[in-house]
Amino acid sequence: MSGAHRLIILVAGMPGSGKSVLSSIARSMGIPVYVMGDIVREEARRRGIEPTPENLNRLARLLREEHGSTVVAERTASKIASDDHSIVLVDGVRSLDEVAVFEKLGKTVIVAVHASPRTRFERIRRRGRPGDPTTWEEFRQRDLTELGFGLGNVIALADYMLVNELSLEEFEAEAKRLLSRLTGQG
């Protein structure tokens, strides 16, 4: 697929904001979804590393040290480049340098998903994923780590902002409306 004719929807948001819900809606609309964290999980599998949150964070840092700060974006972009879909969604962009990698592949649109820290903390506690913070202090530290990657800059410069303080059903409807508008399906 020629880059000039490809739309790449880049999704950014803090942990617990609702990025995976937006990705699920995209999948249900037939939009291929690339989750940047999957690149790190694949590398862990390749190296025989148990995919615990601590190991994955350590491996992500190591990959960036070994191959540069955009290595995860570059590997994701490589997969997109061999995809013939005219619209794709990338879940988990964390820095403007990563955005620049995807801009080489086509037209990019950044969608930020935002929810207040208290809302996100409660969601994270309820979802109970392995490795999720269980205390407010752990949660705040994880936020600072994410912001240290430059995530706040991506969110601040987003083309669209979905505020997710709503019920799941209301957020899903908002997400579907936005994706329909972006993809011409609505």
UniProtKB/Swiss-Prot annotation:
What keywords tag this UniProt record?
ATP-binding, Nucleotide-binding
Q: Please tell me where ATP binds in this chain.
A: 13-20
The protein's matches in InterPro entries, at most eight in alphabetical order, are given as: NTP_hydrolase-rel, P-loop_NTPase
Identify a single GO molecular function assigned to this protein: ATP binding
SUPFAM superfamilies under this entry? P-loop containing nucleoside triphosphate hydrolases
Q: Which Gene3D superfamilies does UniProt cross-reference here?
A: P-loop containing nucleotide triphosphate hydrolases (3.40.50.300)
User: Membrane-spanning residues where?
Assistant: none
The family this protein is said to belong to = Belongs to the UPF0200 family.
HAMAP family assigned = UPF0200
Q: How is this protein named in the record? A: UPF0200 protein Hbut_0338
Q: Which organism is it from?
A: Hyperthermus butylicus (strain DSM 5456 / JCM 9403 / PLM1-5)
